[in-house]
UniProtKB/Swiss-Prot annotation:
Its job: Rho GTPase-activating protein involved in the maintenance of tight junction by regulating the activity of CDC42, thereby playing a central role in apical polarity of epithelial cells. Specifically acts as a GTPase activator for the CDC42 GTPase by converting it to an inactive GDP-bound state. The complex formed with AMOT acts by regulating the uptake of polarity proteins at tight junctions, possibly by deciding whether tight junction transmembrane proteins are recycled back to the plasma membrane or sent elsewhere.
Gene that encodes the chain: ARHGAP17
Ranges annotated as biased composition (Acidic residues): 872-881
Comment, domains: The BAR domain mediates the interaction with the coiled coil domain of AMOT, leading to its recruitment to tight junctions.
Organism: Homo sapiens (Human)
Assembly information from the UniProt record: Component of a complex whose core is composed of ARHGAP17, AMOT, PALS1, PATJ and PARD3/PAR3. Interacts with NHERF1, FNBP1, TRIP10, CAPZA (CAPZA1, CAPZA2 or CAPZA3), CAPZB, CD2AP and SH3KBP1/CIN85.
Official protein name in the record: Rho GTPase-activating protein 17
Domain Rho-GAP, first and last residues per copy: 252-442
Ranges of compositional bias, category Low complexity: 653-664, 679-698
Domain of life: Eukaryota
SUPFAM superfamilies: BAR/IMD domain-like (SSF103657), GTPase activation domain, GAP (SSF48350)
Length: 881
């Protein structure tokens, strides 16, 4: 207690008073002392932060630490998930990645154990052991110095007071002297020990810095091992990724998609084309009418994942067409490539048609192989779609307008308006002729089901769908679909099949019963007399349900040539003629029909041909007359008793319609008129009635109106792209058609030219390449004797007209026709199907044809069923009157 009291007293004197304070450390040792505090603080914080970096539990062995790592938990989760997705790409990826994460966790645990042992623990020893020991010695030295100063101060005080009281102080002074010497020795010992420890610490500073070098080396080694694990795992995962073909197709370069999937045609293109071939070829406004956004998004997602379950999209062809447009537009590079953009635009401005086709052919050959194959596939489909433009209204021009901007665009696009203004015109000028001449650009046949992955489903037996002869989907089966014409057509066939009467709904898509009557001419004019020695060529009568199908097969391949006539409206009518379905008569086979027309001879047929009678419309039949507008829709009345002999002028025995099989022209230009060759048989006297005219009779007669006839036409036949030459049968005689052959040879010529120097086809008739355009103007003024009649119709007899009372409606002005010398009185009278014959002494003639055979009179007694069927039709059409 006395020593402690002396220390406090001495410390107070040194702090407050003026007592001398002894400093035993040198300047170097004082500097080392100040650094110790800084080093201790640094080591303490470094240790604390390193421990925080550990992901495992601090202070445990490597195995236990590995189990506690977050990476280990992640690896276990991935491996467990991979067992639930064994056969999928995701399952394989999870399994491989889980193994890699487990290896990384093992490397990490070993790394942390090493860092903890080699770095963290030594830093902890520096901060918490070595430096504190030195600091303790420094404090001990400070206490010894205080003791030494206190003893020395007391000794000095005793030595001063010894002069006044010398006898009693010698013993006390000696004691203080000894105590002071002892304290000084202790100070020196402590000072030496402290200095040694400080110098040792400074000597070890290089070793302490090596800890951090070891830390970085340990981290580098850990990362190298981890990188080795990753480099070993990544190729395996990439292999799984490359082997898995189900990757998005939209927005992927065409070459990459084809290489990855191993396909020749891009999946979205082939899938959409196959779907449209099944259900979309008769959809009006295909590629032009937008689809629902949700439906389109769903279809694109289904195509992206390469799913084969696309049955639900059969009912919405507009969504399929929208997906095809979207795929073409989302390609990083257009199908017609950026590199050829300048060449395409330059070719578009060429005025000469032949040179333009040659340049287009050369540019097509420059396309990359993958682009060329897919472009050819798409163009072939679009050409097939354009063949049914009479139904879907998608002519080559319309298709080019809608799809062109999705096939070619500039590399650096501006705004949408600028792109549309700069590109659309050029693209349309390029795409339209390629579609029109698709068979010349790509003469080889294209199998649309390239991958053989699309199998058409069987049609239910209740869906009696039917096709016209040249329909684009005649080789596929119709599917039931809402808002589609296929179901409506099938229903109409079922409803009217009992009367052996088919209605071609394609001629007027939105026409009901009233419209169907309005689009047909009200009256059928009698025909000029013909020789009675000829027979109507006909075949066996088909069953009611298959009448359209047989007529399709019979007239589907009739070649359309330059001699085909396309009748326009008469001067007095404001509406174009509308085609109407045939009755039970089927169009004969093309070989027989064409050979008879081309040869100009009459081919006798069997007596069963008398059952092939049907009512037809004149070749230049005009639109509906005012009388038809007064008709009302009524149910068919039962057939009344028939009179024994109908009027001689009744044209009930006419054969199939001679109307052009082309649909009404959609072009703003009026169709041209082409005169027919004069008839070959005009020797029958006017007073002799035609034998076939006795086979049918109207239900009632009027004193001023002629019996109403319901004209019937064969189904409209869209022209084919590649027209074969017309071949005559061996028994047919006469030269081939002089007008059709040049046109056809002009189309066949390019197929024999060398590929590098193509010769463009002589410009074919517009009606051949585009059904919506009128016939070429050059045929309008051609020689009437060489003009070819319609190649897809049956010749029909000409009954003798019967004088009728004069009605109140005057006939319209008629263009002059070509007649024989014996019919010079009829040159100013034009045929009409919607006007009433006004002169009781005159006969209304029809545009003359090369062959107008007439049936034998003995066949009249064999066609009672045909008369009944035709009477039912007449009764239906004349109910309002």
């Amino acid at each position: 207690m006395k020593k402690q009291f002396n220390r406090m007293k001495q410390l107070a004197n040194q702090t407050v008073g003026r007592a001398e304070k002894t400093e035993v450390l040198s300047e170097d040792l004082l500097q080392i002392e100040r650094r110790l505090d800084t080093v201790r603080s640094i080591c303490h914080h470094s240790h604390k932060r390193l421990v925080a970096c550990f992901q495992g539990q601090h202070g445990t062995d490597a195995e236990r630490r590995h189990k506690k790592l977050p990476l280990t938990a992640l690896a276990q989760n991935m491996q467990e998930a991979s067992t639930q997705l064994e056969d999928s790409l995701l399952g394989k990826m999870l399994e491989t990645c889980g193994d890699a994460e487990n290896q990384l966790a093992l490397e990490l645990s070993q790394h942390e154990v090493f860092v903890e042992k080699e770095i963290v623990d030594p830093l902890y020893g520096i901060a918490e052991v070595e430096i504190p020991n030195i600091q303790k010695q420094r404090k001990q030295l400070a206490r010894l110095v205080l003791d030494w100063d206190s003893v020395r101060a007391r000794w000095n005080q005793a030595h001063k007071s010894s002069g006044t009281n010398f006898q009693g102080l010698p013993s006390k002074i000696d004691t203080l002297k000894e105590e002071m010497d002892e304290a000084g020795n202790k100070v020196e010992q402590c000072k030496d020990q402290l200095a040694a420890d400080m110098y040792n610490f400074m000597a070890k500073e290089g070793e302490y810095g090596k800890f951090f070098v070891t830390l970085l080396e340990a981290q580098a080694d850990y990362h190298r091992k981890a990188l080795a694990v990753l480099e070993k795992t990544l190729p395996e995962m990439r292999a799984h990724q490359d082997k898995w073909a189900e990757k998005p197709a939209f927005g992927t370069p065409l070459e990459e998609h084809l290489k990855r999937s191993g396909r020749e045609i891009a999946l979205p293109i082939e899938a959409c084309v196959m779907l449209l071939l099944e259900t979309g070829m008769k959809e009006e406004g295909l590629f032009r009418i937008g689809a629902g956004a949700s439906k389109l998004k769903k279809l694109k997602a289904a195509l992206d994942c390469s799913t084969s379950h696309l049955d639900e999209f059969y009912s919405d062809p507009h969504a399929v067409a929208g997906a095809l447009k979207s795929y073409l537009r989302e390609l990083p590079e257009p199908l017609m490539t950026f590199n050829l953009y300048e060449e395409w635009t330059q070719v578009a401005s060429v005025q000469d048609q032949d040179k333009k086709l040659q340049d287009l052919w050369r540019t097509c050959q420059k396309l990359p192989p993958q682009n060329f194959v897919n472009f050819r596939y798409l163009i072939k489909f679009l050409a097939k779609l354009a063949q049914t433009s009479d139904v879907n209204k998608m002519t080559p021009s319309n298709i080019a307008i809608v799809l062109g901007p999705n096939l070619l665009w500039a590399r650096n696009e501006g705004t949408l308006a600028e792109m549309a203004a700069a590109t659309s015109v050029h693209v349309v000028a390029v795409i339209e002729p390629i579609i029109q001449h698709a068979d010349w650009f790509f003469p080889e046949e294209v199998e649309f089901n390239v991958s053989e992955a699309f199998v058409p489903l069987t049609t239910p037996s209740s869906n009696h769908s039917f096709h016209t002869g040249n329909d684009s989907d005649s080789g596929t089966l119709e599917r039931k679909r809402p808002a589609s014409m296929a179901v409506m057509e099938g229903d109409l066939v079922k409803k009217e099949s009992f009367g052996v009467k088919l209605m071609d709904f394609q001629a007027h898509r939105r026409g009901g019963t009233l419209n169907r009557k309005h689009i047909s001419p009200a009256f059928q004019p009698p025909l000029p007399p013909t020789d009675g020695s000829t027979v109507v060529p006909a075949g066996p009568e088909p069953p009611p349900q298959s009448s359209r199908a047989e007529s399709s097969s019979g007239g589907g391949t009739v070649p359309s040539s330059a001699g085909i006539l396309e009748q326009g409206p008469s001067p007095g009518d404001g509406s174009p003629p509308k085609p109407k379905d045939p009755v039970s008569a089927a169009v004969p086979a093309p070989g027989r029909n064409n050979s008879q027309i081309a040869s100009g001879q009459n081919q006798p047929q069997a007596a069963a041909g008398s059952h092939q009678l049907s009512m037809g419309q004149p070749h230049n039949a005009a639109g509906p007359s005012p009388h038809t507008l007064r008709r009302a829709v009524k149910k068919p009345a039962p057939a009344p008793p028939k009179p024994g002999n109908p009027p001689p002028g009744h044209p009930g025995g006419q054969s199939s319609s001679g109307t052009s099989q082309h649909p009404p022209s959609l072009s703003p230009k009026p169709p041209t008129r082409s005169p027919s060759p004069p008839t070959q048989h005009t020797g029958q006297p006017p007073g002799q009635p035609s034998a076939p005219s006795q086979l049918s009779a109207p239900r009632r007669y009027s004193s001023s109106l002629s019996p109403i006839q319901a004209p019937n036409h064969p189904p409209p036949q869209p022209p084919t792209q590649a027209t074969p030459l017309m071949h005559t049968k061996p028994n047919s005689q006469g030269p081939p058609n002089p007008m059709a052959l040049p046109s056809e040879h002009g189309l066949e010529q390019p197929s024999h030219t060398p590929p590098q120097t193509p010769t463009p086809p002589s410009t074919p008739p517009l009606g051949k390449q585009n059904p919506s355009l009128p016939a070429p103007q050059t045929l309008a003024g051609g020689n009437p004797e060489t003009a070819q009649p319609h190649a897809g119709t049956l010749p029909r007899p000409r009954p003798v007209p019967k004088p009728r009372n004069r009605p109140s409606v005057p006939p319209p002005p008629q263009p002059p026709g070509v007649h024989s010398a014996g019919d010079s009185s009829l040159t100013n009278t034009a045929p009409t199907a919607s006007k009433i014959v006004t002169d009781s002494n005159s006969r209304v003639s029809e545009p003359h044809r090369s062959i107008f055979p007439e049936m034998h009179s003995d066949s009249a007694s064999k066609d009672v069923p045909g008369r009944i069927l035709l009477d039912i039709d007449n009764d239906t059409e004349s109910t309002a009157l």
